[in-house]
């Protein structure tokens, strides 16, 4: 347990909007609005045993697939594309990039292990974000590493896709079938990290 004291006049819940706690430069606590992005400190008891998985992470939700020799995680809590990208980066990876039919099969099989009931929220559960998007040039689909889909090795879109339906579908996704789709970047979806 870390011993700390509240700063003078804290907590005060000023304007009834201060629901988060911060640590000031003097090592004292204060309540602040949660909407403000701030640096943070993680705490772990010394007694907590942490094991690194075969994926080189402490996150047990990453699984190594021997066919591709890559690790994958399907996030079931939805995020928009940019937040999904950040989540994968924070975990030391990136949004999954499909390099061949085998990798599409791997993601399809992983997706199948998660029925709709395992996904939280009101959003489409038949697709997930992966690491490609339209780089501002219509129909110029590129991975988050800048490769064209052809260079990456997989271009199998579902029938009628990409269609940029009601302009704005500029981000990449995968159906449960393993086929690609263009989706709205700002609408939350499940996502694959690699």
PLM segments and residue spans:
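Acidic glycine-/aspartate-rich tracts in secreted/extracellular proteins
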Residues: 11, 25-26, 45-49, 101-103, ...
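Short, structured beta-strand segments at or near domain termini in extracellular proteins/domains
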Residues: 33-50, 183-194
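Terminal peptide-recognition signature
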Residues: 6, 21, 42, 88, ...
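Conserved hydrophobic ligand-interaction patch in extracellular adhesion modules
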Residues: 79-132
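Extracellular disulfide-stabilized recognition modules
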Residues: 43-93
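Surface-exposed ligand-recognition segments of extracellular binding domains, strongest
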Residues: 1-16, 119-168
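Disulfide-stabilized extracellular beta-strand modules
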Residues: 15-26, 38-40, 69, 138-140, ...
């Amino acid at each position: 347990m870390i011993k700390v004291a509240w700063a003078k006049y804290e907590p005060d819940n000023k304007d009834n909007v201060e629901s988060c706690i911060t640590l000031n430069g003097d090592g004292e606590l204060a309540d602040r609005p949660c909407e403000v992005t701030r640096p943070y400190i993680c705490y772990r008891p010394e007694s907590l045993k942490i094991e690194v998985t075969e994926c080189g992470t402490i996150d047990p939700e990453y699984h190594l697939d021997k066919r591709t020799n890559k690790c994958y995680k399907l996030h079931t809590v939805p995020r928009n594309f940019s937040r999904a990208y950040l989540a994968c980066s924070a975990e030391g990876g990136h949004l999954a990039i499909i390099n061949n039919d085998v990798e599409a099969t791997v993601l399809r099989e992983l997706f199948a292990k998660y029925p709709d009931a395992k996904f939280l929220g009101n959003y489409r559960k038949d697709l997930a974000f992966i690491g490609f998007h339209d780089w501002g040039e219509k129909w110029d689909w590129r991975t988050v590493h800048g490769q064209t889909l052809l260079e990456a090795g997989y271009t199998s879109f579902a029938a009628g896709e990409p269609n940029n339906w009601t302009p704005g579908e500029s981000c990449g996704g995968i159906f449960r079938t393993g086929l690609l789709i263009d989706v709205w970047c700002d609408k939350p979806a499940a996502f694959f990290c690699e």
